[in-house]
C-alpha cells in the first residue's frame, strides 16, 4: 500500500536565510525565533505570510511597528517560528524578537527602539487563581443575610 498522505502534503516553503541575524522574543507564554536579513520586506510566520497567519489588524500593525519606527519598512525580510500562547502573545513575541535582531544589524537603532520599549521583554503574564476565591483577585459573591 502506498502512503497517499505524503503526496497530498503541500511542499515546504524554502527560504534562503544565510547571512541573517537570529534573535528570540518572548511575551506571555509565547516564544518567537526570528531570523532577519536584508531583503524586500516579506515577513513569514511558521511558513505563511504574516497577513495570512494573523487575522486581526492590530496584530499586523504591531508586527510592522519596529520597521515603521526606524523608517525601513521594506529593507528587511523576516522568517519567524512561533510557539505557545495565543495571537496577542505571539505577535508581542515577534515584535520583541524583530527588535532584538534589528539591534544586531545596527547598534545605532538600540536607543530608538529602547525609547519605544520594543527591546524590553514585557514580563506581564496571567496571575494564578488563589484558593478561596473565584478568580485571581475576584472573591465569591458575599451575602449578609
List the predicted regions and their residue ranges.
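N-terminal intrinsically disordered, low-complexity tails
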Residues: 1-13
Amino acid at each position: 500500500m502506498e502512503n497517499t498522505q505524503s503526496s497530498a502534503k503541500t511542499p515546504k516553503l524554502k527560504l534562503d536565510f544565510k547571512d541573517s541575524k537570529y534573535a528570540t522574543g518572548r511575551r506571555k507564554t509565547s516564544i518567537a525565533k526570528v531570523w532577519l536579513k536584508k531583503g524586500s520586506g516579506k515577513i513569514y510566520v511558521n511558513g505563511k505570510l504574516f497577513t495570512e497567519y494573523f487575522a486581526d489588524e492590530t496584530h499586523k500593525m504591531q508586527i510592522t511597528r519596529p520597521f515603521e519606527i526606524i523608517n525601513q519598512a521594506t529593507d528587511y525580510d523576516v522568517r519567524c517560528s512561533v510557539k505557545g500562547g495565543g495571537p496577542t502573545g505571539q505577535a508581542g513575541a515577534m515584535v520583541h524578537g524583530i527588535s532584538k535582531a534589528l539591534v544586531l544589524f545596527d547598534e545605532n537603532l538600540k536607543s530608538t527602539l529602547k525609547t519605544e520599549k520594543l527591546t524590553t521583554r514585557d514580563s506581564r503574564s496571567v496571575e494564578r487563581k488563589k484558593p478561596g476565591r473565584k478568580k485571581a483577585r475576584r472573591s465569591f459573591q458575599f451575602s449578609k443575610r
